[in-house]
Amino acid sequence: MLGDELLPAADHVLPRVIVKNGIVQTSLLIIANCAGAGILSLPKAINQSGLMAGSVLVVCAAILSAYTADILGRCYSLTTPRKKIVEGADAYAPEEPCESSYFARSPYAAIGWKAAGAVGAAAVTISQVLTQFCVLILFLLISGINLNKLIPQRSSLFFSLVGAGALAPLMLLRPGHVWGTAILAILASVILVAVVVILCATDAPHDPYAPPPAVTFSTFGSAFGVILFGFGGHAILPALQATMHNPTPARFRKAIVGSFAACTSMYLASSIGSVLTLGGAVGSDILTNFSGPINTFGLIAGT
């Protein structure tokens, strides 16, 4: 048939191109996932736990989180079938999982399946979905509060709903397609840190200095939870590793070390300056303690 002649032969069908990330791109995605809210909330946490003890706690939390992230990377490598090592290759080449498979879309669930079967996969999936949903709601509420401070004519809940509607289409994309947005997120985080440091180093209007509060078991426990939250985001780490080109544990480890080191530096820079400037007056959102045009610019970047 003439129509059949116009159709390409089966061996000439072009394969679907799958976008893969390198080490630098994966590191940027991890930074964008972790940094942000921690820059605004960690100053109060360090103030509640004491400046020296809080700074040490941040470093320890970063090391612990990086170690557990590395464990996840090694666990994911166990769920990926390996091809025969080719002479001259620097590492094994994992076979591509079936794109229609559920585990191809949820590598964390694949780890749970490997460890405990269907029960483990279901438990991991439920925990992952609940965690991501709660974090999403938290970030939307923070964005709504920041926008409400800039435009008080509308409520913070209104801006949270607008943000949810604007971000909803992005959830249909793969991590490999949206890694460029990580650059914008990191740029916003760097701007936010620079704004906080400038506000602390200059005579920008801010709340009066107050003596640091006494460290108690309750305040230290609250600070500990907030600091650990600043290094969270492990739920999507297996998915980020799955989008890497040649996702070996060694390559993923390089992305982890670089990203967590960058997050730690940003957290300490903004937190130490805020505590030294404001003392016990540090609020849950550090930008609420300052005012002026520079602070407004920081609110926009933080949102």
Name these PLM-found stretches.
Residues 6, 18-19, 24, 76-128, ...:
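Membrane-interfacial loop- and helix-cap regions that link adjacent transmembrane helices
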Residues 21-43, 47-54, 58-63, 118, ...:
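Hydrophobic transmembrane alpha-helices of multi-pass solute transporters/permeases
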Residues 43-49, 144-151, 163-185, 243:
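Membrane-water interface regions at transmembrane-helix termini and the short interhelical loops
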Residues 57, 64-65, 69, 189-192, ...:
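Alpha-helical transmembrane segments of multipass membrane proteins
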